[in-house]
């Protein structure tokens, strides 16, 4: 039985500080009295995380970052450390997005190091996993997902394995402005696999969100699937009205 249903959005490389604060203020005015079965979260760009967190500090909305380094400090020019994110008051951090894997050399090992660092510093890792179209068509999807999940968890030891961890299943072929949403049945099947693999490595099965062209038209059907524990929304939620619309649809469908 679901205790909470996660519904959030990552803004990627979008929004000025003024735009981010406008979104946050709209959301802060909506959330009081909203369905407490749903846990909202937003993931702004680094330039806005502190201010957005402050703007939402009186609400239950969680705020995260889109990436971080695994080291606490050091000669890592251009990187952001876990203590820096905690200093901003952040609750979670998105790790392993396919764009970072493809364009910035992210690997299962570095995702694993970052996952362990996030847990160490009291943040929830939101670990993105997903197969490419070529991997799906060649029958490798299950093997790819299993390897990504195992890699993300490989450096967790002892009590760290009991920390709150989230996965987001984002098939690479389903994301972006040209993405084709996965069918609800297919997404549910792949998310069941992720839960099986993660559940064998952790004391409890972590929640798995679905991300990949989530929109007002498919949100309710996705929410109705037993293995989909939340929605991780892209461009359909980049405007406050769009995000609020999908929050309402998720609430009605639970």
UniProtKB/Swiss-Prot annotation:
Pathway: Carbohydrate metabolism; erythritol degradation
Keyword NAD recorded: no
GO molecular function: triose-phosphate isomerase activity
EC number: 5.3.1.33
SUPFAM superfamilies in alphabetical order: Triosephosphate isomerase (TIM) (SSF51351)
NCBIfam families found in the cross-reference section: PRK00042.2-1 (NF000722), tim (TIGR00419)
Role summary: Catalyzes the isomerization of D-erythrulose-4P to L-erythrulose-1P.
Protein name from the UniProt record: L-erythrulose-1-phosphate isomerase
Organism lineage: Bacteria, Pseudomonadati, Pseudomonadota, Alphaproteobacteria, Hyphomicrobiales
């Amino acid at each position: 039985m679901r205790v909470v249903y996660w519904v959030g959005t990552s803004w990627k490389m979008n929004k000025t500080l003024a735009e981010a604060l406008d979104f946050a203020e709209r959301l802060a005015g909506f959330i009081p009295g909203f369905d407490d079965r749903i846990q909202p979260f937003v993931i702004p760009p680094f330039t806005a995380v502190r201010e957005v967190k402050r703007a939402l500090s009186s609400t239950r909305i969680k705020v995260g970052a889109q990436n971080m380094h695994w080291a606490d400090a050091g000669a890592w020019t251009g990187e952001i450390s876990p203590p820096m994110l905690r200093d901003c008051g952040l609750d979670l951090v998105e790790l392993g997005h396919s764009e970072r894997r493809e364009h910035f050399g992210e690997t299962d090992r570095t995702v694993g190091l970052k996952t362990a660092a996030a847990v160490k510093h009291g943040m929830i890792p939101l670990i993105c996993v997903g197969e490419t179209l070529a991997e799906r068509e060649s029958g490798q999807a299950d093997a790819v997902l299993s390897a990504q999940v195992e890699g993300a968890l490989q450096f967790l030891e002892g009590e760290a394995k009991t920390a709150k961890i989230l996965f987001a299943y984002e098939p690479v072929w389903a994301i972006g402005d040209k993405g084709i949403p996965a069918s609800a049945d297919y997404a549910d099947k792949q998310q069941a696999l992720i839960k099986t693999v993660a559940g064998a490595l952790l004391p409890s099965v972590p929640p798995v969100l679905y991300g990949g062209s989530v929109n007002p038209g498919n949100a309710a059907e996705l929410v109705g699937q037993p293995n989909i524990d939340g929605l991780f929304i892209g461009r359909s939620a980049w405007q406050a009205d769009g995000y609020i619309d999908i929050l309402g649809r998720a609430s009605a469908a639970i």
